[in-house]
Amino acid sequence: MDVEGLVEQVVSGLGFELVDFETSPKGRLMRVFIDIERGVTVDDCATVSNQLTRVFEVENVDYDRLEVSSPGLDRPLKKTADFERFAGDEVQVRLRMPIGNQRNFIGVLEGLSEGVVRLHTDKGDVAFPFDEIEKARLVPKF
């Protein structure tokens, strides 16, 4: 059974975006990170948690603990839609392979077009294929 697919179906059915899904090595702990344009509330987390608990019971998904939360201020960017939605925000990106001896970049996300992500950094503009991103997240504003 594809547990992540099941979680995605439940979360999107409730009107939320599944940002990330993590399980412990033995699958005993499940972490679900949700988001919505207006921001996630504690009640939203409870609603998703209750619905997932019911679905897991019906589908016989074996687990010990379920955690549902917002992705936080340093939200990870994983999908192409994330790179469009957060254009204009400051991001931190780690690439799989270096560009000019550099794998880590911090800059303002200019967006994504035709599979290429563009950043404006202190050292100038940089562009790289979306598929080359190992990890990306928002830089919190304080």
Swiss-Prot record:
Cysteine disulfide links: none
Record bears the keyword Transmembrane: no
Record's keyword terms, sorted: Cytoplasm, Ribosome biogenesis
InterPro entries: Ribosome_maturation_RimP, RimP_C, RimP_C_sf, RimP_N, RimP_N_sf
Transcription regulation is among the record's keywords: no
Biological process according to GO: ribosomal small subunit assembly; translation
Any Pfam family hit: RimP_N
GO cellular component entries: cytosol
Subcellular location: Cytoplasm
Role according to the record: Required for maturation of 30S ribosomal subunits.
Xref: NCBIfam families: PRK00092.2-1
Similarity remark: Belongs to the RimP family.
Protein's name according to its UniProt entry: Ribosome maturation factor RimP
